[in-house]
Amino acid sequence: RDDRGTEHRFDALPQRIVTLLPSLTETAWVLGVGPRLVGVDRFSNWPADIAALPRLGGLDDAQIEALVRLKPDVVLASTSARSLDKLESLGFRVMRLKSETHADVRRTLGLVAQLLGTPEAGERVWVQLEVQIAAAAARVPAPLKGQRVYFEIGGGPYAAGTRSFIGETLVRLGMANIVPPDLGPFPKLNPEFVVRARPDLIMGVQREQAALLARPGWQAIPAVQGQRVCGFASADYETLIRPGPRLGEAAALLAGCLQRLAVEPAR
């Protein structure tokens, strides 16, 4: 049963798999069924082994005709995918999975592992992720624990809230979040909200860092004044914002930046 409540029954293990979300592509690969992938979304880029696979659009513009030609046994997609109703009407199986929290990631690993015939692999991967996150938490310098973080999604105005998988990782690392839980996992924020919240640390993608620091009024933010900003290279940022089997790697990236900030003099 997927996260829309749809029950899926298969007479045989799916041999031809399409994934329409990078985290689901990565999940299938880590669970050991990468060779069964026959197509992926346009944003999937890890691991490098998938580079030659057909690209089939995204959640909102999946290339239905190309998908039909591939004759997949199952399509793995997000619950928010709006372009796959036609594919389902043609009799294809679409398994829709939610990925906003750590619990979602764990459930997705289990569901996909069961679907693809490797039921024990899902929990094994999750246990490895837990170990990696704990190891990252142990690396966070004590003086930074409890500091309040603003994690920006893309170039804004969305943020990773306390209830998102990113926010949950930050909590595991001992950090606080300027976004209150009642705003949801990935709320749209007014820039003035961030100014008023006065985060101690800002995290986001490196290519947006200069524009972020130059926003009106943001010079009053403690994180900007002290240049306490984690700007991640695009490849690392993609790891951070994908709710899948690289959560442990993401935690290590966050911890690494916090370690660097701890040894750099505040400005």
What is the predicted role of each segment?
Residues 64-72, 89-90, 188-198:
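Short helices/loops that flank or line small-molecule/ion binding pockets
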